[in-house]
């Protein structure tokens, strides 16, 4: 109407009117489809369009000025109409794109939607909007592809991940994870794991209901999706430790332990061991062991006294008994190859198969609420990946959290970790070692947890320690450092007579890698420090194993990160066993006197105090000894 009443620039006003009518027609379409429009770009586009229409109206109203004086004082540059025409064109393009991108899967064309003018300065934003819109309205196949695109974007750049969250991508990703086909679910789980890179992002996902969806998938989803979901749990827990308890409240700890236990250890009946198979295995085991008793743990998940399913059989004996019996009964085929690390050949070409307790699930059984249907038919690589990701998730959930560590240790997880440390694939072994390292670190600080979970007479604890020591004795694995730390964390749980872990740790003091020597020194310090009730016994064991000479070498010639750790350990040994003949012969007092003159070694007040005490004790006892000898 204002354009029709214009008294100047009539042609330009008519052009603006034509474009405005076209824009209004598009806005009416948008209003009719408002419930289907993707909210984030809709808000921005409608706000911009409203401003453009206000400016267009203001410009046209100026052209209605009547009278010479009004026209003189109302100066309208010709460029203003060109600029306004361009802005209206942009708004038409934006609203047209919004209608296309918000169309349902059936109405959407497969052709490229183009770049809306509003996103010209930030084209990646347009791509994110487009993919999220597909997640809202596309077919399941298109939604899967859109999730894969978001995975690629989130992996490439942290800022893109932030944009995906800000533009409302979490909700439709969770919906796809819950309702999509397997490939779409995998892509959605990957995207969620990649998006949870900082506390704010994870908190946003928690509010969006990620815990509930993850619990549902870990209970009922396909194993491949469950494995990626377990990985996503580990990512979220690693980047926002405050979400650990929320995951625990949704039963995720128990579900992860169930995945870890599947085909790993013989379980209570709730873990679905077929009774007729168990009976036949039991009979053969009893005959094989010359009528000795094989005690199988049947505790509930929340009891801590656990007996190993192998009883008093060696692992290889148990493996032979179980696999041969099940092969005879037609329960399962003997495994040929389970991933890269399940079958290894030695130089003579003989094949050593890692023992693995297989069993036939009951038809209607369920494993702690996990859907068992078809799980035994999954390929070995998927099963191994599932275990690796379950262990990884438990590792990050356990870190620094006493209540979760208690839940884990009261379940079958310790037995699982012990078995998987020996025979799992590389990833499974590493994640199991890291989980044990974190659980033992919490137990070191939490007396109640340490006493309940790592009692000296606990069969599960013994098995864990055995496996940790095997890895430490081999000393050629990436598992070495987490295993050293785990043994050090358990230093207060060992009896005075149990010194078998000292010698392997002392041997590592002579390791070429500084990091290994440092961790070995830290672990031994936990045995020899005053806080350890058995510090005297452990200090003597370190001396007997030849620790003094290695420590002297490290204090004199080690890298700086090792020197201080070695000095602290040497001080504790000198403090507790000052009358040792070995220390006197090794001239430890001379070493301590030299160290006390090195400024960088005495900067720490605690170390300086310990050093002076150790020197005083050695001087006192060794001066007495010298008088006795002469």
Residues covered by each model-derived region:
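Alpha-helical solenoid repeats of the armadillo/HEAT superfamily
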Residues: 1, 10-22, 45-55, 62-65, ...
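Short, charged/polar, low-complexity loop and linker segments
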Residues: 1-7, 24-41, 61, 65-73, ...
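N-terminal "cap/leader" segments of large eukaryotic alpha-helical scaffolds
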Residues: 1-8, 77-155, 339-377, 615-630
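Alpha-helical solenoid scaffolds in large eukaryotic transport, assembly, and signaling factors
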Residues: 3-36, 149, 153-168
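Short, surface-exposed loop/turn segments at secondary-structure junctions
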Residues: 6-13, 33-44, 65-75, 163, ...
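Eukaryotic intrinsically disordered, low-complexity regions
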Residues: 117-196, 203, 207, 215, ...
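Buried hydrophobic core positions in alpha-solenoid tandem helical repeats
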Residues: 130-132, 172-174, 205, 213-216, ...
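Intrinsically disordered, low-complexity acidic Ser/Thr-rich regulatory segments
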Residues: 303, 310-393
């Amino acid at each position: 109407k204002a354009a029709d009443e214009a008294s100047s620039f009539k042609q330009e006003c008519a052009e603006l009117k034509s474009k405005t009518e076209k824009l209004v027609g598009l806005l009416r379409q948008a209003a009719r489809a408002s419930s289907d429009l993707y909210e984030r770009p809709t808000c921005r586009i409608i706000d911009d369009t409203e401003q453009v229409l206000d400016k267009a109206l203001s410009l046209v109203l100026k052209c209605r000025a009547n009278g010479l004086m009004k026209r003189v004082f109302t100066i309208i540059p010709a460029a203003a109409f060109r600029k306004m025409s361009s802005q209206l064109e942009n708004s038409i393009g934006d609203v047209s794109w919004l209608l296309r991108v918000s169309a349902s899967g059936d109405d959407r064309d497969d052709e490229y939607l183009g770049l809306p003018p509003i996103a010209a300065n930030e084209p990646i934003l347009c791509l994110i909007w487009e993919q999220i819109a597909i997640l809202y309205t596309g077919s399941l196949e298109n939604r899967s592809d859109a999730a894969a695109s978001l995975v690629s974007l989130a992996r490439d750049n942290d800022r893109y991940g932030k944009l995906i969250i800000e533009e409302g991508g979490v909700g439709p990703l969770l919906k796809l994870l819950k309702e999509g086909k397997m490939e779409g679910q995998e892509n959605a789980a990957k995207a969620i794991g990649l998006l949870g890179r900082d506390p704010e992002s994870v908190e946003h996902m928690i509010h969006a209901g990620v815990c509930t969806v993850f619990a549902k998938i870990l209970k009922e989803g396909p194993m491949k999706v469950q494995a990626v979901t377990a990985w996503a749990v580990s990512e979220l827990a690693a980047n926002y430790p405050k979400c650990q308890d929320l995951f625990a409240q949704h039963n995720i700890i128990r579900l992860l332990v169930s995945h870890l236990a599947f085909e790993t250890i013989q379980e209570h009946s709730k873990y679905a061991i077929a009774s007729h198979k168990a009976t036949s295995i039991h009979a053969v085991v009893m005959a094989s062991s010359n009528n000795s008793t094989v005690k199988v743990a049947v505790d509930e998940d929340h009891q801590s006294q656990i007996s190993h399913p192998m009883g008093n059989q060696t692992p290889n004996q148990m493996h032979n008994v179980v696999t041969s019996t099940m092969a005879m009964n037609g329960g399962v085929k003997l495994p040929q190859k389970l991933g890269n690390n399940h079958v290894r050949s030695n130089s003579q070409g003989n094949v050593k198969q890692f023992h693995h307790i297989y069993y036939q699930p009951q038809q209607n059984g369920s494993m702690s609420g996990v859907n068992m249907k078809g799980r035994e038919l999954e390929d070995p690589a998927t099963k191994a990946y599932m275990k690796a990701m379950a262990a990884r998730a438990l590792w990050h959930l356990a870190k620094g959290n006493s209540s979760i560590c208690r839940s884990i240790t009261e379940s079958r997880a310790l037995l699982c970790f012990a078995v998987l440390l020996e025979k799992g694939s590389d990833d499974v072994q590493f994640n199991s070692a890291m989980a044990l390292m974190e659980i033992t670190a919490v137990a070191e600080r939490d007396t109640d947890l340490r006493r309940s979970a790592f009692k000296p007479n606990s069969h599960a604890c013994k098995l864990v320690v055995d496996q940790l020591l095997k890895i430490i004795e081999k000393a050629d694995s990436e598992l070495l450092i987490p295993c050293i730390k785990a043994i050090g964390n358990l230093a207060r749980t060992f009896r005075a007579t149990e010194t078998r872990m000292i010698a392997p740790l002392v041997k590592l003091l002579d390791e070429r890698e500084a990091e290994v020597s440092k961790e070995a020194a830290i672990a031994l310090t936990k045995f020899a420090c005053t806080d350890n009730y058995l510090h005297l016994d452990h200090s003597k064991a370190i001396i007997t194993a030849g620790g003094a000479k290695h420590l002297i070498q490290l204090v004199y010639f080690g890298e700086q990160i090792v020197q201080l750790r070695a000095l602290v350990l040497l001080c504790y040994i000198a403090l507790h066993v000052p009358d040792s003949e070995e220390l006197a012969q090794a001239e430890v007092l001379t070493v301590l006197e030299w160290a006390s003159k090195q400024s960088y070694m005495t900067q720490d007040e605690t170390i300086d105090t310990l050093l002076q005490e150790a020197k005083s004790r050695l001087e006192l006892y060794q001066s007495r000894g010298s008088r006795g000898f002469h």
